[in-house]
Amino acid sequence: MSKVLSTLRYSAEHEWVDAASPTKVGISQIAADALGDVVYVDMPEVGAELTAGEPCGEVESTKSVSEIFSPVTGKVVEVNQEPVDNPAVLNEDPYGTGWLFTVEVSEEGPLLSAEEYASSNGGDVE
């Protein structure tokens, strides 16, 4: 089973949120495993205004293209270049070096605890 980190919160669309300030966002290992080999990542630019639940980028794999939905409302303050340069990092380390961007949050969207997310999606909480 895919790993779900207990220290993070999750959106129903498979993004994770680390609530430190600024808030770090990524995709879950469950999402990365379902996508297969990731070959391309498109993310919002620094300064972009995001709305919780709205698309803000996409991840392309050898199997499909999936949108990235912002789990929070706010302004992008940093984009991680690593997944752009090496998209496979989303498969290898989605909770570490594979984080996507950080946001100065003005409002959170509906988020699930690790236990709720794992229960709904078949992951193991660690």
Please report, for each region that a protein language model flagged, where it lies by residue.
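Charged, alpha-helix-enriched surfaces in structured cytosolic catalytic cores
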Residues: 71, 85, 112
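Short, Lys/Arg- and Gly-enriched loop/turn segments at beta-strand edges
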Residues: 60-69, 86-89
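Residue-level recognition of beta-strand microenvironments
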Residues: 17, 62, 79-82
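ATP/adenylate-binding site constellation spanning eukaryotic-like Ser/Thr protein kinases
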Residues: 22, 70-73
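Acidic, low-complexity mobile loops and tails
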Residues: 1-55, 88, 92-126
